[in-house]
Amino acid sequence: MDNYEKVRVVGRGAFGVCWLCRGKNDASHQKVIIKLINTHGMTEKEENSIQSEVNLLKKVQHPLIIGYIDSFIMDNQLGIVMQYAEGGTLERLINDQRAIKDSNMREYFPEKTVLDYFTQILIALNHMHQKNIVHRDLKPQNILMNRRKTVLKLSDFGISKELGTKSAASTVIGTPNYLSPEICESRPYNQKSDMWSLGCVLYELLQLERAFDGENLPAIVMKITRSKQNPLGDHVSNDVKMLVENLLKTHTDKRPDVSQLLSDPLVLPYLISIHCDLGRIEPPPTDKRKPSASLSSRLRTYPTQSTLRPYSLSSNAPTTHLTQLTPMPSHIDSGFFSSGRTSNQRTQSRSQVHSKY
């Protein structure tokens, strides 16, 4: 903690407290989140759980995942230093929008915004799933945002699990409203459980209410195992309703995986737009890699928003001209998104590039 100054508590968890801190030794006084965990009296199982979280944070470095910066041990406390997301949680954004809706203004998020958020989460999950990691607690509270509310970052890997290539987990864990049927029924589960949770998040973004809610846990579980939720409103297009329906299939073999969704015509235009912009996101502070030449060339050859024209199976797809583009397979994620520009390159290009990121 010698390099950081505490500002305020921003969260409390099962093992510790999360502090917003600022750096002492750099001119910018960079703000970070430091999770302080009291290790005194911990059981071996609890220590392994904490170490697992640190290892996963190191392993999943990605522009759309909260970045790991450092860790330290001091006075029987383990400190995990992570990126700070100024925009707060997606849960707070939904609650604010719900308050507007409840004031009889009937304001929902534009479907384009919802699908952009959805695709960002999908890309981050793809990065995790390719590493055989299941998040296990995907929910709006664990999705953070930048100050402009344009970039989402997955967070809170305290209960994430790394699977073997052919294994499945069986521990019942996660937030009740977003649990998949297989977890509720104590059946083995895998990455498809994250897809169910993603469907719940998508439903909530569209409807501003939880897909599965009830007065008590048994009532919630019963709704989940039967996939019984209120129908989406008329403000949601049929294509997006079908997307939610597919994600909330009770049988995992009927539920799409990440790679299937990344090639879906409904998602593809947003995927291309995000691919064009992610090279402009600052990489995590620990990422010392040099900018990728292939990344720069891809950013130059992809169209910009000013040169795009409408494309869609759905009227809600963003403006995109795809006739000369080859759809990108999902496996390019790990290579394409792992690269970033250096600070000098970003400074030089900032005046020339107008990006939501």
UniProtKB/Swiss-Prot annotation:
Membrane among keywords: no
Keyword Ubl conjugation tagged: no
Function: Probable serine/threonine-protein kinase required for the completion of molting. May play a role in endocytosis in the hypodermis syncytium.
Entries under InterPro entries matching the protein: Kinase-like_dom_sf, NEK_Ser/Thr_kinase_NIMA, Prot_kinase_dom, Protein_kinase_ATP_BS, Ser/Thr_kinase_AS
Originating organism: Caenorhabditis elegans
Enzyme Commission number(s) from the entry: 2.7.11.1
Lineage of the species this protein comes from: Eukaryota, Metazoa, Ecdysozoa, Nematoda, Chromadorea
Name of the gene: nekl-2
A Pfam match: Pkinase
Protein name per the record: Serine/threonine-protein kinase nekl-2
Biased composition (Basic and acidic residues): 281-290
TM annotation in the entry: none
Residue ranges, compositional bias (Polar residues): 293-327, 336-357
BP GO terms, sorted: molting cycle; positive regulation of endocytosis
Family: Belongs to the protein kinase superfamily. NEK Ser/Thr protein kinase family. NIMA subfamily.
Broadest EC class assigned to this enzyme: transferase
Binding site for ATP: 10-18, 35
Active-site residues from the entry: 137
Gene Ontology CC entries for this record: cytoplasm; nucleus
Catalytic activity annotation: L-seryl-[protein] + ATP = O-phospho-L-seryl-[protein] + ADP + H(+); L-threonyl-[protein] + ATP = O-phospho-L-threonyl-[protein] + ADP + H(+)
Keyword entries, A-Z: ATP-binding, Cytoplasm, Developmental protein, Kinase, Magnesium, Metal-binding, Nucleotide-binding, Serine/threonine-protein kinase, Transferase
